[in-house]
């Protein structure tokens, strides 16, 4: 799909919307010609108190246009979020006008839709208000909205169970062997970034050392440990052992109630890696289909 952006450079938001609504398409940033039948022109005009987004879209010759006005307040960080939400909503509505269909999760992309109802309920909204917000503002189906709110309630209950001096740790491994067909992320596979893997691991170990010193100085304990990605099992068994050995040496893992590593795709897992995980006390793994 040819994409033309006017008045902004929010490529990520537009590409996420394209992948969500038109999963077979890939972004091409070139001028739109009269012979092209699959394209989107996303325009933004921003003022002090709001913005106007217009999306003109053609998919296989069927065209639709949607225009959306959205208020904008707050600091630049807050305005950036509102701007991206407006672009995402407008693109979704234009695409819906072309296809006549909507994914169960509506305009939401990525892997953390539960953050929205969790944030709302933490601020005082009822579960019903959070559910209605997902359906009204993000076009999520009633079934998925109910699922998200149920998960948000479980998340808030888990947060309430944390003691004041406890923290949860996420260790990110942002590499994948190849791109999965179901993945909505705009990313590169490890074949193109393999040279960065070892330097990244070196830097990660330095950061873990620094974190260990902070936890020791502040007297905080570690409640949960989760290694995700990407695909952590893109690392070799030797690299995994090196990483988890350092974690054991400098982090207070003995108090963890959950020690999880996202094993990712079955083709990245072998016996040697599983033995490394088990040997370091990992009690839970997740495997993608």
PLM-predicted stretches and their roles:
Residues 166-199:
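Canonical Radical SAM [4Fe-4S] cluster-binding loop centered on the CxxxCxxC motif
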Residues 76-102:
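Accessory, often N-terminal, substrate/partner-engagement and coupling regions
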Residues 81, 193-201, 233, 237:
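Flexible, glycine- and charge-enriched loops at secondary-structure boundaries
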């Amino acid at each position: 799909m040819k994409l033309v952006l006017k008045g902004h450079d929010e490529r990520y938001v537009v590409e996420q919307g394209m992948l969500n609504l038109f999963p077979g398409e890939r972004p091409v940033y070139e001028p739109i010609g009269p012979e092209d039948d699959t394209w989107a022109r996303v325009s933004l005009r921003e003022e002090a108190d709001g913005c106007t987004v217009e999306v003109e879209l053609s998919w296989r010759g069927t065209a639709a246009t949607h225009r959306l006005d959205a208020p904008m307040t707050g600091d630049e960080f807050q305005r950036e979020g509102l701007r991206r939400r407006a672009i995402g909503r407008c693109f979704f509505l234009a695409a819906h006008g072309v296809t006549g269909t909507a994914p169960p999760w509506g305009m939401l992309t990525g892997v953390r839709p539960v953050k929205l109802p969790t944030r709302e309920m933490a601020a005082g909204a009822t579960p019903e208000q959070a559910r209605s917000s997902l359906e009204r503002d993000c076009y999520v189906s009633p079934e998925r909205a109910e699922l998200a709110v149920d998960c948000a309630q479980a998340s808030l209950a888990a947060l309430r169970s944390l003691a004041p001096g406890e923290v949860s740790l996420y260790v990110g491994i942002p590499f994948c062997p190849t791109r999965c067909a179901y993945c909505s992320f705009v990313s590169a596979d490890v074949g193109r970034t393999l040279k960065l893997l070892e330097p990244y691991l070196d830097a990660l170990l330095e950061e873990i050392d620094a974190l260990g010193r902070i936890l020791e100085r502040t007297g905080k304990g570690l409640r949960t440990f989760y290694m995700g990605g990407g695909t952590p099992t893109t690392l070799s068994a030797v690299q995994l052992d090196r990483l988890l050995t350092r974690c054991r040496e400098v982090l207070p893992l003995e108090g963890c109630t959950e020690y999880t590593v996202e094993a990712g795709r079955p083709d990245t897992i072998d016996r040697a890696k599983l033995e490394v995980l088990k040997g370091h006390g990992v009690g839970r793994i997740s495997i993608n289909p």
